[in-house]
Amino acid sequence: MLFRSVVGKLATGPSPETFALDERRRRLYVANEEGSTLSIVDIDQNIIVHEVPTGAEPEGVLISDDGKTLYVTSEVGDLVHMVDAEGGHVVQDVVVGTRPRRFAATPDGKELWVTAELSGEVYVIDRARFAVSGKIEFLPPGMRKTDVTPVGLVMTRDGKTAYVTLGHAAHVAVVDVSSRRIQGYILVGKRSWGITLSRDESKLFVANGFGDDVTIIDAKSRKAIVSVPVGRIPWGVVIDD
């Protein structure tokens, strides 16, 4: 296989925003921002199996561990949709904060955490009841509340710690998952968006959209090691380690 070359294309709806991959079922689930739909794509046949209507500007997509249920955010609708992955239809909606963006699920399967960018909060959803069970607010030192625009979040495999990017506030929040208390803030670059952990969870990588760089953080000390210049307006980050 040639690296840095296009090896194929898959069908989606208009303006695909984010996606989730189910390797076992060979399905790709794509949020189409301008189409206000979720495309369920059969990878092997390269066809759209279902086109699921959603609220306006869908973005975040998450698959349940058993592959049967999808969760999709609608930024304009302030909604999280629960979708039947096989049947291709919305089962239930829950209202969250303003402009919901991304997800993380607790490893025990009990909770779904959702960033609400313009509310400056993370909403916690009880998956059994599919209802909001709490929310977490953020305010790093020296920042205005209006600067806090959370987008990305990631949890450690043991489910004990969550990291949340705070957008214009230029920090990453460290949250104790069980108590939902903020343990600290890490200064990063301008408009922190995407975030991921290294495989051994020793480092965090944060895309700074207005800084044109990626900040690498030592997870143990909770301090930035270096910020690496990249292309313009980096948005997401994936580590192949």
Model-found features: residue ranges?
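Predominantly soluble domains enriched in secretory-pathway, periplasmic, or organellar proteins
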Residues: 1-241
